[in-house]
């Protein structure tokens, strides 16, 4: 075969993919990363990280860069393209990118997740015109303005706290009677003067002219409708798997779209592994993502050794 054959191609440069790259490279594998956006994954879009062992508190972009820098120092290359398709080519795996095709012995799918949308009136119309899914990216545009955050988990509460340092007022809207977020975060939000919290509220419409001007929500108990005048909304209501076309390999779970693996992070196809938030599991944290990446890399190495490559 004239084309270069990699030992391992990692799809995704979030914590799982970067951790896998470190262990794969240190074990002697010829490894390359494919990333369609930027290194660090969702960490790079997080205002602050306070639950990663060994680091009390660090801005998300800084932690993402430290991970990326460690991989660069090992001379691991990153191709900035989308991975469109994975297929089998004899005993190898073929990965079709936007402008080229890679041949590899093993693959780690670490594509992560995408933001879930509300699918309500006005959402698509005002996306990038006031509706955002990244507070650290777009929050500074709304200094001393009124903004809203929709969601009840850690991400929603964390980003509301961050936005409160920028915006004049932050309306934090949950469709549940209480937050799912850590109590420490909820306490901080409750004690932040310019955060107003709403429980049992279902947002059903965004409105405006050229840009977002407000939203409407309904009280799930009284059915009362309230209109809020805001200039930006940040939605954090969960995640959807970021999938790749795998033809008929049946790697992705057709029910929920995530990937089921064994304890070694191997999928239903030998030599194809998965790591991080794309894996079908209950807990998705930075620590669990890096853990998956390490295991996947070590067993990719074991797979190659076992097959006498």
Curated annotation (Swiss-Prot):
<dbReference type="InterPro" id="IPR008255">
    <property type="entry name" value="Pyr_nucl-diS_OxRdtase_2_AS"/>
</dbReference>
<dbReference type="InterPro" id="IPR050097">
    <property type="entry name" value="Ferredoxin-NADP_redctase_2"/>
</dbReference>
<keyword id="KW-0676">Redox-active center</keyword>
<feature type="binding site">
    <location>
        <begin position="35"/>
        <end position="42"/>
    </location>
    <ligand>
        <name>FAD</name>
    </ligand>
</feature>
<comment type="subunit">
    <text>Homodimer.</text>
</comment>
<feature type="binding site">
    <location>
        <begin position="277"/>
        <end position="286"/>
    </location>
    <ligand>
        <name>FAD</name>
    </ligand>
</feature>
<keyword id="KW-0560">Oxidoreductase</keyword>
<feature type="disulfide bond" description="Redox-active">
    <location>
        <begin position="134"/>
        <end position="137"/>
    </location>
</feature>
<keyword id="KW-0963">Cytoplasm</keyword>
<dbReference type="InterPro" id="IPR023753">
    <property type="entry name" value="FAD/NAD-binding_dom"/>
</dbReference>
<dbReference type="GO" id="GO:0005737">
    <property type="term" value="C:cytoplasm"/>
</dbReference>
<dbReference type="Pfam" id="PF07992">
    <property type="entry name" value="Pyr_redox_2"/>
</dbReference>
<dbReference type="InterPro" id="IPR036188">
    <property type="entry name" value="FAD/NAD-bd_sf"/>
</dbReference>
<keyword id="KW-0521">NADP</keyword>
<dbReference type="GO" id="GO:0004791">
    <property type="term" value="F:thioredoxin-disulfide reductase (NADPH) activity"/>
</dbReference>
<keyword id="KW-0285">Flavoprotein</keyword>
<comment type="similarity">
    <text>Belongs to the class-II pyridine nucleotide-disulfide oxidoreductase family.</text>
</comment>
<protein>
    <recommendedName>
        <fullName>Thioredoxin reductase</fullName>
        <ecNumber>1.8.1.9</ecNumber>
    </recommendedName>
</protein>
<keyword id="KW-0274">FAD</keyword>
<keyword id="KW-1015">Disulfide bond</keyword>
